[in-house]
C-alpha cells in the first residue's frame, strides 16, 4: 500500500494517469509487471487498463441507471468474460465488499459508503495487479472513510493487491506503508515504505 501525497497541482493526477496507463510519460520508463508500457500500442494499453488496473474515484463514477450488479459488471463488457460467468463473478465481488444485499439497487438508492464499496467491487472484477484510488474517501464522512480504508487494507493483506492511494490528506497517507510526496510535478520525499 502506498500513497501519492500532494496538494492540488502537485502532479498527483498526472502520476495516476501514467500509472493507470491513461497517459504516456514524457521521459523515463514505466514497467508494469516487467513490461515497458510506453512502447505499447494503444490497443494493448487499453487491454492492460481493463485487465490489470482497477480504478476507484472520489465521486464513484457509477452508471446512474444501472443497478449495483450491472455497475460491477461494466469492465467485463470490454474483456473476454461476459454474461454467464460474469454475473456470478460480479455477485462474488459484491459479497466481498458486503454489498450483495444491494445488488438490485441503483446508485441513487445507496449511501456514499455503499457507492464506494460498489466502485471497489467494480475495480476488483478483473483481478487487477494494481488498484488506483483517487481521493477514495474525499466524499465520505470520517467513519465511512475508515471503513473504506479498512477494505483496502484487507485487499492488500489477504489478496496481495497493490493499492496506490492518491490524496492530499496527510492523515490518510499515514495509513499506507509507503508515502511518496509530490510538489510541482516532482517527487520531493519518499519514505521507501518506512514511517
Set out the residue ranges of the language-model regions:
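ABC family nucleotide-binding domain
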Residues: 3-182
Amino acid at each position: 500500500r502506498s500513497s501519492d501525497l500532494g496538494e492540488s497541482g502537485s502532479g498527483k493526477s498526472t502520476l495516476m494517469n501514467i500509472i493507470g496507463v491513461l497517459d504516456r510519460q514524457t521521459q523515463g520508463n514505466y514497467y508494469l509487471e516487467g513490461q515497458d508500457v510506453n512502447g505499447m500500442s494503444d490497443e494493448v494499453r487499453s487491454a492492460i487498463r481493463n485487465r490489470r488496473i482497477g480504478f476507484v474515484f472520489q465521486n464513484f463514477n457509477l452508471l446512474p441507471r444501472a443497478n449495483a450488479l450491472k455497475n460491477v459488471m461494466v469492465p467485463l463488457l470490454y474483456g473476454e468474460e461476459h454474461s454467464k460467468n460474469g454475473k456470478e463473478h460480479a455477485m462474488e465481488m459484491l459479497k466481498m465488499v458486503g454489498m450483495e444485499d444491494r445488488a438490485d439497487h441503483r446508485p441513487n438508492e445507496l449511501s456514499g459508503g455503499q457507492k464506494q464499496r460498489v466502485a471497489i467491487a467494480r475495480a476488483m472484477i478483473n483481478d487487477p495487479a494494481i488498484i488506483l484510488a483517487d481521493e477514495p474517501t474525499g466524499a465520505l464522512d470520517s467513519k465511512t472513510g475508515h471503513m473504506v480504508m479498512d477494505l483496502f487494507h484487507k485487499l492488500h493483506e489477504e489478496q496481495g493487491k497493490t493499492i496506490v492511494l492518491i490524496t492530499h490528506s496527510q492523515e490518510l497517507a499515514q495509513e499506507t506503508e509507503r508515502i511518496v510526496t509530490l510538489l510541482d510535478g516532482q517527487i520531493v520525499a519518499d519514505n521507501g515504505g518506512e514511517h
